[in-house]
A protein has these predicted regions:
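Short, cationic/aromatic linear interface patches
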Residues: 34, 42-74
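Alpha-helix initiation and capping sites
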Residues: 25, 37-41
Length: 74
């Protein structure tokens, strides 16, 4: 499986999908890793890691949107 991963953002996208227990949406996380600033993704991931949510992917997307809006306002 790793033979298809040639760039760092792809690796980080796979890492996100595994951490969020959402491997079937790994393409989405690879795209986010390519287009969204890394600090926003890491903050959203740490927020989800500290939570006890059933749907970690949805919580991650919600928090990421909040962080992006806050960044755009400042």
């Amino acid at each position: 499986e790793d033979k298809y991963i040639s760039r760092e953002f792809q690796s980080f996208g796979i890492y996100l999908s595994e951490e969020l227990d959402d491997y079937k949406h790994r393409g989405l996380y690879i795209k986010l890793a390519k287009t969204v600033h890394r600090s926003i993704l890491e903050k959203a991931l740490s927020f989800v890691a500290d939570s006890n949510a059933k749907n970690k992917g949805a919580l991650f997307m919600w928090k990421m949107k909040q962080l992006r809006v806050a960044k755009d306002k400042s």
